[in-house]
Amino acid sequence: MSDSLTHIDASGQASMVDVSTKAVTVREAWAQACVRMQPDTLLQVKYNQLQKGDVLAVARIAGIQAAKKCADLIPLCHPLALSKVSVDFELDETNSTVLITSYCKLSGQTGVEMEALTAASVAALTIYDMCKAVDMGMVIEQVCLLEKSGGRRGHYRRGDTVS
């Protein structure tokens, strides 16, 4: 891994990285977020009983839309032509959580890590928004990159070193 920050130019100013000379390769990234809530709130999500509607369906669409808008939200991100975005949910009644996993893919000159992280984060925020009327104490946690592949730096899996 490089010790220098790629978004800082020689004069110390923030700048967008020039990716024009990078090879076009298939890039993939997986990210997660977790929403911890009251057990009753989780049951209302599971059985689609909240007044605002189908929480997981809306959160899925919000996460997909967020990945597509990542460059509008994070100033130095490149606008990307994503070929695939998915957002999936795992309801854990024992821990009263919704685990969100996002996946982004493209063939391009820069990675999709930020898009995957944005998808998982916005899906979590959407769950919070749709459930806050019954549970303002929810906690969004464990937002992280799980895995990425493609590009010059190769494969990364959380817990591993960059190869």
Swiss-Prot record:
Gene3D superfamilies assigned: Molybdopterin cofactor biosynthesis C (MoaC) domain
Catalytic activity, as annotated: (8S)-3',8-cyclo-7,8-dihydroguanosine 5'-triphosphate = cyclic pyranopterin phosphate + diphosphate
Active site: D129
The protein's annotated pathway: Cofactor biosynthesis; molybdopterin biosynthesis
GO molecular function: cyclic pyranopterin monophosphate synthase activity
Pfam (any one): MoaC
EC number: 4.6.1.17
Signal peptide (from-to): none
InterPro entries attached to this UniProt entry: MoaC, MoaC_bact/euk, MoaC_sf, MoCo_biosynth_MoaA/MoaC, Mopterin_CF_biosynth-C_dom
UniProt protein name: Cyclic pyranopterin monophosphate synthase
Binding positions for substrate per the UniProt entry: L76, C77, H78, M114, E115
Subunit structure: Homohexamer; trimer of dimers.
Gene Ontology process terms (BP): Mo-molybdopterin cofactor biosynthetic process
Species in which this protein is naturally found: Cellvibrio japonicus (strain Ueda107)
Superkingdom field: Bacteria
Lyase found in the keyword field: yes
Keywords for this protein: Lyase, Molybdenum cofactor biosynthesis
Family: Belongs to the MoaC family.
